[in-house]
Amino acid sequence: MIKKILPDLIAILAFVLISFAYFFPADIEGRILFQHDTAAGAGAGQEAKEYYEQTGERTRWTNSLFGGMPTYQISPSYDSTVPLQWTQKIYQLFLPTYVNLTFILLLGFYILLRAFGIPAWLAGLGGIMWAFSSYFFILISAGHIWKFITLAYIPPTIAGIVLAYRGKLLAGGILTAFFIALQIMSNHVQMSYYFLFVILFIAGAYFEDAWRNKTLPRFFKASAVLLVAALIGVAANLSNLYHTYTYSKETMRGKSELVQTGDAAKQTSSGLDRDYITNWSYGIGETWTLLVPNFKGGSSSAPLSQSEAAMEKANPMYGSLYNSLPQYFGSQPWTAGPVYVGAFVLFLFVLGCFIVKGPLKWALLGATFFSIVLAWGKNFMPLTDFFIDYVPMYNKFRAVSSILVIAEFTIPLLAIFALKRV
């Protein structure tokens, strides 16, 4: 038994060491990273925090935002999720902040690859490929922690789905229910919603395989188990989901009482304004950042004066101007950094397109292309308009460029499949 799980234990220990090493020495010196969104959230919750300290009761209303709004939209807290919160701490091995984030990112993708039957050493490499793409550390620096944690729980959720379709119904159902519950508790529904498309692609691949092998009853049985598991995971967070749903009707995500007509119409029948949805759209040419990180300059927060290549040809007379200009020159209003998966990983992905066989390869290819094109947003409006108008809930979310997290997931996954074939 010990011999069988020893490679997995070694991988987990390696992930802990890697996570500590990445944040060294800050993780042992008690340094605190300034994160804009985290600081803004702390400010918004200060009134509710002071009320709790004075009375010992949690208020469900604050005047700190938008002239007054429910606190459960700022920092949801429900007694029903307390067991989940403790389970989450155990899963994170009670590691310190930031170290725990990197650890669960590594571990989640490792679990997924092991569900596919990938050897432990190769699954460990896959976890590193996934975790150390640029986007996740940009999320940490910006303070988008809920989004980060939600994304960390998505690979093990899909691992449960894979196990179920591979015939391990009990293990697959438990894993799916558990990580769906953690995922929704992390409170970034947009990321969970986007990965429903990935799940559809993967389920489609297993359906095709079942059709070819005449094992459709087994496929539908696994699908039924997964549906029950999903309902259990959702039910564990029903309080938060219900309150979010009811409150959303009174916000800009609900149906507008004022309707524009004619060419000026930008408002969807219900949901966000089209311009607001697509304001952060990845440029078509900007897609090259998957291969070349600074193809569009890099970060908006980095001044042009810090670019050695640009300064070699710059006129020194305009030095103060260069300090105020960003390095980024893409189509988004601003960005903290590019979506970069790594040249080596992308090479393996392309290799996988040729040497990996079976419907799962086409599912991953389709999901990759799908996410890239949808991330273009206002730069490819025919498809974007179709999704806004006809795909349920798509118009509830803004910053369509963030759907590129799908490509960040599928590219290293197919890359590891390619390495297994080599």
Q: What are the language-model segments listed below?
A:
Residues 18-112, 116, 128-151, 265-268, ...:
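Membrane-interface coil-to-helix junctions
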Residues 1-5, 162-174, 206-221, 357, ...:
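Membrane-interface junctions at the ends of membrane-embedded or membrane-associated helices
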Residues 108-115, 121-209, 222-244:
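Membrane-embedded helix bundles of polyisoprenyl
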Residues 106-110, 154, 158, 238-241, ...:
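Alpha-helical transmembrane segments of polytopic integral membrane proteins
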Residues 100-104, 148-156, 196-197, 341-344, ...:
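Membrane-embedded alpha-helical segments of multi-pass membrane proteins
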